[in-house]
Amino acid sequence: MAVEKFETALKKLEDVVRKLEGGDLSLDDSLKAFEEGVKMASFCTKKLDEAEKKVELLLKKKDGTFVREDFRLDDE
């Protein structure tokens, strides 16, 4: 995939959604747009997952010191 930046992929995904919601595309063009949207959504999800793994939270303990912890969502 030629897309390298999250922001670029997100913009393309938003454009695809707008086109599909417009209802003016032929069935063939709709399928092509949908396929492109799925690719962009997958790329964005991958980039967000990579970023999440890099994020660390700096938490203040009761004694005033700070501890670093990996970022985790509550459902993990």
Swiss-Prot record:
Its EC number is 3.1.11.6. The keyword Signal does not apply. It catalyses: Exonucleolytic cleavage in either 5'- to 3'- or 3'- to 5'-direction to yield nucleoside 5'-phosphates. Its main location: cytoplasm. It is an enzyme of class 3 (hydrolase). Pfam families: Exonuc_VII_S. GO terms for biological process: DNA catabolic process. It is found in: Cytoplasm. GO terms for molecular function: exodeoxyribonuclease VII activity. Belongs to the XseB family. Heterooligomer composed of large and small subunits. Bidirectionally degrades single-stranded DNA into large acid-insoluble oligonucleotides, which are then degraded further into small acid-soluble oligonucleotides. This is Exodeoxyribonuclease 7 small subunit. It comes from Geobacter sulfurreducens (strain ATCC 51573 / DSM 12127 / PCA).
